[in-house]
Regions:
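N-terminal low-structure segments adjacent to metalloprotease catalytic domains
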Residues: 1-73
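Low-complexity intrinsically disordered segments
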Residues: 26, 140, 274-287
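Charge-rich, solvent-exposed alpha-helical interaction surfaces
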Residues: 28, 35, 61, 104, ...
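Auxiliary, metal-adjacent structural segments of Zn-dependent hydrolase domains
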Residues: 73-139, 149
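Metalloprotease/metallohydrolase-associated module, dominated by Zn2+-dependent proteases
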Residues: 113-122, 126-136, 148-150, 188-271
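Post-HEXXH active-site segment of zinc metalloproteases
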Residues: 136, 150-158, 170-198
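Short active-site segment of divalent metal-dependent hydrolases/proteases
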Residues: 165, 169
Length: 287
């Protein structure tokens, strides 16, 4: 969403969610984040965020982590295995690598780093044999970082961009509404092809995958193409899969009244941007 919508619009979305009914003046990002945390505590009270003292972005409080981890268990067949007995030493070691990825992200695009720090209030590590972490709409602003030892800092940075994007899409939907009837999203007749997994998935999951793939492609334009990526496919493969996802999603949209104008706006922006990327890739090949 950062590359789709821009820095100022990302801030605007957080402001509209958290401050639209506030009387006080919001004249700093820290004040905005404080109101954002209050908003999340009000609407997602099962995963409370501490408001006393300075909130540490890297969380090792196992009792708090357990409450968040429940929300990351997933639904259906894609349930991750989460090791709630992960030792503290493993958490601290993993989070030090996450910090290196976050530093790289900030170096590549400081504005993206600012949005990350505004939106993501909690990063935590728990081991998993079958997942690399994730985000959930049931606990916005959290990222489960089940990073792997063989990942480079570039891999970790891409993972953070990936999960930030999921969070930004969740906030955007909360603010503007994307769908006319969420109960129809998991109807198999409304499935669309994922850009990342390249399989048919529920409609909103496919849309998330498309926006994530777009953001990673745009991020790589600034960070460079990884020589041996472990988190996402090579860019040309991801671009091709993303264009297929666009057509798959449009096929559903054309045959239903499932989406709101905001959804169509984002889809149009992503499609235009992907075609621009396609032309730039073709130019590189020709040269």
């Amino acid at each position: 969403m950062f590359y789709v919508d821009g820095y100022e619009n990302c801030i605007k979305t957080v402001f509209l969610l958290a401050c639209s009914h506030q009387q006080q003046t919001i004249d700093s990002l820290q004040k905005l984040k404080n109101q954002y945390i209050c908003f999340l505590n009000k609407h997602f009270s099962e995963t409370p965020i501490p408001t006393h003292g300075n909130l540490e972005q890297f969380c090792v409080d196992i009792e708090r982590i357990k409450k968040i981890a429940v929300k990351h268990q997933g639904k259906g067949s894609r349930k991750p295995k989460i090791d709630l007995n992960t030792p503290l030493a493993s958490m601290e070691e993993a989070l030090s690598h996450v910090k290196n990825g976050q530093i790289l992200l900030n170096q590549v695009n400081p504005s993206l780093g600012t949005i990350f720090d505004l939106v993501i209030h909690t990063l935590f590590y728990l081991r998993s044999p079958n997942a690399r972490g994730g985000s959930t709409s049931d606990a916005p602003g959290t990222i489960w970082c089940a990073i792997k030892r063989h990942w480079t800092d570039m891999d970790t940075a891409e993972c953070l961009v990936h999960e930030l994007t999921h969070n930004l899409v969740v906030l955007d939907e909360l603010c503007y509404q994307h769908y006319t009837d969420r109960s129809q999203l998991s109807n198999k007749k409304n499935y669309a092809k994922s850009s990342i997994l390249k399989i048919e998935r529920p409609f909103d999951n496919a849309f998330h995958s498309l926006v994530v793939a777009h953001e990673i492609l745009r991020y790589r334009q600034e960070a460079g193409e990884p020589s041996n990526p472990h988190v996402h496919p090579p860019s040309e493969q991801m671009l091709s899969a993303s264009l297929e996802t666009v057509q798959s999603i449009k096929s559903v949209v054309d045959n239903t009244d499932l989406v709101q104008p905001r959804f169509s706006e984002i889809l149009g922006k992503v499609e235009t941007s992907l075609h621009q990327l396609e032309k730039s890739f073709q130019t590189v090949v020709v040269v």
